[in-house]
Structures are given as C-alpha cells and as structure tokens.
Amino acid sequence: MPSMKHNLLALLASGTALASIPALAQEANKPLELNTVVIQSDGNGGTTRSEGLGPVKGFVPRATTTGSKDSVAIDKIPQSVSVVGRDQMDALGAQKIDEALRYTPGVLAQPFGVDNDTNWLYIRGFDATANGTYLDGLQNFSYGFGGFLIDSFGIERIDVLRGPASALYGGANPGGIVNYISKRPTGERLRYLEAGINSYGNGYLGFDIGDKATETVNYRVNGKIQGGDNYTDFSKEFRGVISPSIEYKPDESTSLTILANYTHLDLTHDGGFLPYYGTVVPTEFGKISRKANFTEPDVDSYDREQLSIGYEFEHTFDSDWTIRQNVRYGFANVREHSLYPYGYDGFLMQPAAGNPYLARINFKHDTTVNTFQADNQLEGKVTTGAIDHNLLFGAEYRYFRIDQMQQTGGATIIDAYNPVYGEPQGPMWDPYIDQDLRRNQVGVYAQDRMEFGDGWILTLNGRYDHIWTEASGLPSFEYDTGRFSGRAGLGYEFENGITPYVSAATFFNPIIETLYDGSYAKPETGVQYEAGVKYRPTFFDGLITASFFDLTKENSLTGSSFAREQLGKVNSRGFELEMQANIAEDWKVTASVTAYDLKVKENASDESLVGKRPYLLPEQQASVFVEYTVPEGALKGVTLGGGVRYVGSSYADEQNTLKVPAVALADLKIGYEKDNWGIDLNVTNLFDKDYVAGCQGVYVCGYGEGRKALLRVHTKW
C-alpha cells in the first residue's frame, strides 16, 4: 500500500505547515513573542479526568485516558479507540474480559475457545495477551506463566487503543493495547448485589458498595465469590475476588485514590490442545467430543494467589498545571500441574491405522512474580500565538521479577474417543527452566496536542525507553536495549461532528527470548500508517469510527520454540468500522466490521512462507448487538436483546493448506427491571453450533464454547 503511505506523509507534512500559518500571519504584522504564555481553561474537548475513567452511559463513550494519558474526547485521538462500558458488558452477559470484547472491531477474543485462567486477546493480528494489557494505565506484563488475571466484575470499563502505543506506553504489543479501568469511588451512595448461575452449574455472588465516609473521604468495595463446573469434562473452579478502594479529596484541586485487589483461584483445566485431525476434520474414528478433556482428574490442578495495591495522586496548581503519580505493586504466585495432548500416539498429526490414542505431555510449573511501576506526569495548557498547546510530560519506571520453575515428565497415552483415566503417570524430570529473571525499564515521554484554526488538531508524541534484563539460573543471560518511539497525527473537527484524521506511529516491543545461536532477541520494531474518520452525530447519541491502516512488524520470531530465529517481517493492513449508539433511551446498538490482509513479508529461514497468512488469525470479522427496553405499558421494564458474531476462516498451518472454517454465532438476552430489582437471561451460541475456534498449529486446536445460558438476579438500594 505505498500510495497510502505517501498520501499520509504528505498530509502530515501539510498539517505541520498549516500549524505555522497563523504564526506567520502574526509575524507579518509584529514579532511573535513565544515567551508570552496564556493559560487555557479547556483543551480536552470539554472532558474531565473522571469522564475518561468513569462509567459509560449506555453503549456510547465520550472520553478516554488511554489514547493520550490525559482525559480527552475520543474524537481528538488520532488512532482508533473503542470503549466497552459496564452497561454493554452486562447487556452481553460477559463474565470475563475476553467475553466482553467479542463485539469489538480489530480484536480477536478467545482464539482457542474457553480458557478460564487466561484472557486471550489479539489486536490487528498481533498477540496482546502478554504485553498489551494494562490496568488503570499501568502495564500487566507477563512472561512465561507469570502474569495477572483480572476479573471483569471489578472493572468499570475496557478501553481498546488500536495500533502502536509505544509513544505513550513504551514497549507494547504493536497491534494495540487493552486498558482495564477499575471501579472506583464516586462520592455517591451505592448498594448493589448480584447473583447468577449458568447452565453448567457454575454460580456466583457479587457485591458493590460505596459511599462517603466523611466530607473528604469516599470509599468503594466490590467483590465476588464463584464456584462450580465449567464447559469441559472434569473442569471446575472456585474463585474469590475483592477490590477495595478509597479516595481522599480535601479540595477540588487534590485527590489521592488507593486501589487494591486480592484474587484467589483454584481450578482444574479446561482441556484443549487438540489435533486438527479429529476436530476440524474427522479421522477414521470420527470427531473428538468438544467436551473431552484429556488431563488426569486426580493430577490436574491450578492455584493462583494474587495481590496488588497502588495509588493515583493528582494535584492541580493555581496555574492549571497538573501533576500526577500512578503507582502499583503486584504479587502473584501461580502453580499448575496438568497433562496435555500433543498429537496422536508417537506425536503424529494423524492417528496410525486402528490406533485412536493421543500422546500426552506431563507438565508442571511453579511461578512467582513481583512487579512495581510508577508513572509520573505533568500536564498543562499554554498558548503560543494562535495555537493552543495541551502539553504532557512524563517519566515512568517498571520493575518485573519472575522466579519460575518448569518441568515435564512421563505421561501415558489416552484414547481420544473413549478415554479411560487413572493410570499412574511417570516421574517428573529435572526442570528445563529454573530461573530468576529481573527486568528494569525507564522511560521518558512528551506529548503536544495542538489545536488551531477553528478545528485543526495536530498531535505529536515522543518517548525513549531503556530496558535492562538479567536472568540467573537455567537459562541465564544479560541484555539491555533502548529505543525511541514516536507518533504524529493530524485531524480536523467539523461542526457537524465529523473528524477525519491521519497518523503515523513507530513502535518497539522488547521480548524475552534467546535464539538458536545463544544470542538475545532484538526488540520487535515497526511502523503504522492510519487514516480514518470519527463521526459523532448531532441528531442521536452515537459514535461511528472508520479506519484504514497499514502496520508492519520487523524482527518477528520464526522457527520452532526450540530453535528460534529472528528473521521475519509481518504486515497487517485493513479496514475497521464501528458504531456504538444510544438511539433514544430505549434502543442501544453496537456493530463492527473488520477486514484485514495479514501476510508474512520476510522469512529468511523458510522463504516458502512469504505471502502466507500466520496461522490462527482470521481476516474477516463482523458483529452486531441490539438491545431494546420497553418504555411504557404492560411490558414496561422488559428488555430484549440479541446479536450475531461472525469470525472468518483461518489456517492451522504455516503453509496455509489446512483451513479452519468460518463461523457465525447468535446471542440472546431477555431481561426485566422493576423498581430496584432486575433479572436477566443471557444465552450465548444460541443454536449450539459445534465449531473449532482456532488452531495454533496442527497440534493445538480448541473447540469454541457450546450454548451457555446465564441467569442473573440483581438489586440495588
């Protein structure tokens, strides 16, 4: 798409020239005095920070802190931004983060089907699970099995910034980031209780309580306890989550919010890791049951203890300059033991004649993670000539330490079509990873959002990061790297609510990986060009976003996990369309279309893969969900909702010879509200379609979840 790149660069260059026109006009009459500074009262599109962090009314967001770190109207961000608020999460019946994002453009959620201990997310074709998720603006980085699992019950909203975010957040997923915004004190009395149970017999009880403690102190506590069976055989769980928060606000200029969370999770695994032959296509024995789980029930275990505590401090001076400090400490210990299938007996892709047995891997790990992050910001607004500057300066520090042990052991084979459990398993072998790894990262950044000429918006970002990584034990290595990232965006706000924009952004993503020759992997790098339009209609409450983008990632890892090379380049370019609307008070709609062209552009170790699509990833997605509430009459308070999700076909192999079919799924919601009580029934995969969600190679396929009904009852007072 070279013409697109040239046009975008030309537009950006013309935007820079336009920014100087008012100043040149002034210079013709008298000298421009740059040292004369005028403080502005508003440069964020009429938004406050609470709007960028707080609840979303219905389905339509207005502001975000994710696309610029300061709270700003979404229309002013020169990239695509989606927000899923609590109202939309509840309408969808989402009980996990990945369930809440199934209707969001550019996001591939649950690519392996059900996984109750991980929120798997891909954005614009790139995996955001480990390095593209954030909680309250601070990264939830994970490596190996050392990460943090966030429960959706404690989340107020989910912001998705599509495209590179390194210019704001440092090293991150090139396809975009997902920022979970915690529920926090509002200063209003809140008493909310919710109970639910699904068709598997998995039930929960949740609460959300908040109020004023004094004139200057507000509090909020939410939590959930949940337990029962899950979708596949032998899969069950018990989890408890509690998230207390307190806000101290002595005056309108100062606030300190303390946010904490404790999570306990005890479960048995969902299964998965199924072969392509036997799931997507049948073998001589037929197809493997979609509820089959080939672990050992007496062995399988997953235990998570997780804690985080931090604060957000903000003070605005009389000059309207604001300082902020966001800090969080996190701890997690995760222990797992399970058996996973890996092909058929002999580790074959297809079963030998008359042999229905699966090979299995006996896997165990013990992982402890400690993290600390501090993000310091200075924000202010000044005017130079005819240009209003919204300035942001920041310095961030991140510390990540993981102490991990991973080992495998002997495992018996098991019949894929008539499994028998309980055979003794072989002993565990010596660990192949026994490591203490530490990573320190320091980043400094600046942003200037310039507004001029009755509608022009020019946004410039720059950030430099340096990262030190040191690992002792097995394996051991030491490495440090630094990189600059930038973003430039130009937009124009018309009075009718239309805002076209163009942007270019560079990125880097430091990865922890040793290559086949013993060297350390370089950071993934690249650039994205994006052009789009955002439309906020004046005749109904809505937001429509359309975008074209061209994103290239270099230094992509290739080869097997035991012989990694870094010789690849992958390109993702395409189109995204999203509409979120509150049509009157009774109708709410969210709809999206995603169309990509995902291709391997370089692979020096295997040139036959050039031009192929990476496995697992579909190139088309589309969805629509509509909710209607009867406003009056005998059926007043009744809510009807429904949606359709389409996920296009993908491949199970690098050569693109084994296809995973596309699927269209229907969802249903029926609800009733009266006074302070409500009851809702959500049914996902309404017609109980049997399908494979995706395959990460021919040995690792996962069924999509069958029909699931969730009944919820809630009250507030």
What are these regions (language model features)?
Residues 249-251, 369, 388-392, 396-400, ...:
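Structural signature of Gram-negative outer-membrane beta-barrels, strongest in the C-terminal barrel
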Residues 58-82, 86, 98-138, 156:
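Extracytoplasmic beta-strand/coil segments of soluble accessory domains associated
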Residues 314-318, 322-328, 332-340, 523-582, ...:
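Membrane-embedded beta-barrel scaffold of Gram-negative outer-membrane proteins
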Residues 109, 138-162, 181-182:
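Short acidic/polar hinge/loop motifs at secondary-structure boundaries
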Residues 153-156, 167-244, 250-254, 307, ...:
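Outer-membrane beta-barrel translocator/receptor signature
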Residues 645-653, 672-717:
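C-terminal beta-signal and adjacent terminal beta-strands/loops
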Residues 550, 567-654, 690, 712-716:
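Gram-negative outer-membrane beta-barrel transporters
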Residues 226-230, 243-316, 331-369, 412-441, ...:
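Acidic/polar loop-and-plug regions of large Gram-negative outer-membrane beta-barrel proteins
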